[in-house]
Amino acid sequence: MAKDVSRRSVIAALAAAVPISGARAADAVRLGMLRTLSPAPFYMARERGYFRDAGLDVTFRFFESAQPIAAAAVSNDIDIGVTALTGGFFNLAEKGILKVIGGGLHEEKGYQGSAILVSNQAFDAGLTSVDKLGGHSFAITQYGSSFDYLIGRLAAKAGFDLKSVQLRAVQQVPNMVAAVSSGQVDATIAIASQARPLAAAGQAHIIGWIGDLVPYQLTALFTTERMIQRNEAVVHRFCDAYRRGVADYRQAFLRRDAKGEPVVDATTDAAIANITVYVFTGDPKAREKILGGAGFYDKDAALDVADVKEQLRAFKARDLVKGDADPDSLIDTRFMPVR
């Protein structure tokens, strides 16, 4: 009798340790990105439980510039990343390691996402429009970065001599902005939430907006071929949750009234509360900065495939990407819609 009781006790204990049918531990996903306003839909998706609903435990890993995010994916320090596409990224993608799988922030005409920011000294000396950038110093993070790419696009658009621009690689985005506000460098590119406060404080000048001059796919979602091969279903679930975040972001920040002005209401304020968990935390001007800096995301975070291919072509033309892989082999459209 005692043996039967003992056996029943053991069986009951083991049964209690077994998860209820259908329940399972959440799949861990490490997402690499910059700690800026740009990845706001991911902040919202996490705060609103969309990743949890998809059976995912998403951890954010923050970086100071774009190229290290791609490197972190290669070294298996992150599973998925959202970043600007750089020469370094494309060089890794051409080796079959990385795949672009979805869209992110898109520079779009009429939406002020990234500004051309000029120091007071340079502005006072005559650098008052984009076509006058030739002969001036320009801060970027690294050679082959998205900023390096963009100065080339601006030169082609505005007609100044790219070779006359003195590029200063300062490694990190905050250093770029600081270099201009302190007058150490004449100009740079800064997202609106960084550029507007400096201009309002009289510490720098905005002479143009990237979206109005050269609309392009500013950031994109990517993962590794290894992640796709081993966890394709996880990537699909991640993208589904991300799309929910993008839908909420568009509803909060991209609606326009009959006059074309942004609609700001309780939906917007709820989104701001989610975002300030990660950026502008405790900043009394957080609401103002977020409203002034919210950029454009396509519906469902659709990827601008044609522009990604154009970025690759431009990097190759400047010998910043060495391979000759088919551009279509770098992009996997199974996970997100295309523009």
Predicted region positions:
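N-terminal secretory signal peptides and thylakoid transit peptides that target proteins
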Residues: 1-17
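Secondary-structure end/capping motifs
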Residues: 229-320
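C-terminal segment of classical bacterial N-terminal signal peptides
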Residues: 18-24
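Periplasmic-binding protein-like
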Residues: 106-115, 200-227, 231, 239, ...
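Short, hydrophobic alpha-helical packing/hinge segments within bilobed ligand-binding/sensory domains
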Residues: 68-70, 87-88, 175-179, 194-195, ...
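Long, low-complexity C-terminal extensions of enzymes
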Residues: 320-339
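Short helix-loop capping/hinge motifs at secondary-structure junctions, enriched
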Residues: 121-129, 226-235
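Short, glycine-/small- and polar/acidic-enriched structural segments
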Residues: 25-160, 166-170, 186-192, 207-209, ...
